[in-house]
Amino acid sequence: EETRPQLVFHSAAYKHVQLMDDFVSEAIQTNISGTVNIADLAAKYRVSRMVMISAANARHPENAMEYSKRVAEIYVQSSDCRLKRDKGETDMFIVRLGEVYPTNTHCLITLSEACMLTLEVGVMGDGGEVYIVGGPGDGLLDSVIGEKIKREKASVDDYEHVREEVLALVQHSYTEKKAILIGLMKKIVPIFPLSSTQ
């Protein structure tokens, strides 16, 4: 009890787009399997809040890295719904970080500002939300804190099915057949599309 964490920020990921397109199995094993491990452990040890750091383009994925981040988001969202249903103690959130200055000057968010806003997200909401920090929003997003944080409520309620699909994908990832792996990720994402925001 003394060493049980209250907050977990899961930011480990492979985010190099071309590298992940070349090594799709690594995108799956790190970005998806790693997230499954962290989410499961956060629930097991009754962490109060888990925040997964995702990618801005996971909303509409176009490459292996973005698909792997969206599949990981789906797993976190379904885990949060299961925990709510089973009266679990852990709330899970997703933060999609936009490009951070100086790598992207049209965004106008610094690294320290991105960190501060991510910490703020860690104490907001009821779980299951996707927060877009420092990235471009669209008409479907509710403004939460001025222009810097947007919220998207996207519920994925079928944990058992999601877990089965995701674990099968991770198992297939050891074959290293890129086209098959991309196809399997694309198959998972449309099954659990983004719902309308609230």
Residue ranges and their predicted role:
Residues 1-7:
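Conserved Rossmann-fold cofactor-binding substructure of NAD(P)-dependent oxidoreductases
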Residues 10, 14-70, 74, 78-82, ...:
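Conserved Rossmann-fold NAD(P)-dependent oxidoreductase catalytic core, especially the SDR/UDP-sugar
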Residues 74, 78-198:
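Strand-loop microenvironment adjacent to phosphate/nucleotide-handling motifs in alpha/beta enzyme folds
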